């Protein structure tokens, strides 16, 4: 039994223009061998996530959903840069390949990174994973361990320090009552 998340069929209405993405990747100097096998990961709370599996590369593409969005709700550049800068101090971050801010490619900003094999924690795990109660417990412990490691990253002397919301931002969110 495999306990690795592999994605599933791309949902109707969420198809990806793979040819446009491939052309763009090639313009970035990325060599792609073979035809892409495209799958989509489900169960996320925000951005759409696709797997593009080539003979020589296994990639993940992240993009915002279609429709009206708050200006900062799906900031692909921020998501990309946080991970790219975090990788210097935290080894569990995937290698960032490229960020596209040219909406003429697929209609929105997106970024591509190398895939890391594993499980994507989410509210409903894919039934094909067939996890036992012990498997789910181990996954939860692993997620907590990684979050603890992440929060111990000394970001203050890295480019990450420049992208925060500033001192007191979280307190403001927690203690500001809606009017």
Kindly give the residue locations of the regions a language model identified.
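Short hydrophobic/aromatic segments of transmembrane alpha-helices and their interfaces
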Residues: 4, 33, 140-141
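Juxta-kinase regulatory segment immediately upstream of eukaryotic protein kinase catalytic domains
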Residues: 2-30
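Conserved small/polar residues in nucleotide/adenosyl-binding loops
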Residues: 175-179
């Amino acid at each position: 039994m495999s306990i690795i998340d592999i994605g599933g069929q791309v949902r109707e209405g969420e198809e990806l223009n793979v040819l446009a993405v491939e052309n763009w990747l090639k313009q970035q100097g990325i060599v792609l061998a073979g035809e892409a096998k495209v799958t989509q990961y489900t169960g996320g709370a925000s951005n759409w996530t696709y797997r593009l599996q080539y003979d020589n590369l296994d990639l993940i593409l992240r993009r915002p959903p279609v429709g009206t969005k708050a200006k900062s709700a799906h900031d692909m550049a921020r998501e990309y840069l946080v991970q790219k800068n975090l990788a210097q101090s935290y080894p569990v971050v995937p290698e960032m390949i490229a960020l596209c801010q040219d909406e003429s490619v697929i209609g929105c900003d997106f970024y591509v990174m190398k895939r890391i094999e594993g499980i994507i924690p989410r509210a409903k795990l894919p039934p094909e994973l067939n996890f036992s109660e012990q498997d789910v417990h181990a996954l939860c412990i692993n997620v907590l361990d990684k979050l603890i490691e992440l929060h111990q990253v000394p970001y203050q002397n890295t480019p990450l320090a420049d992208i925060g919301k500033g001192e007191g931002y979280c307190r403001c969110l927690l203690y500001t009552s809606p009017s």
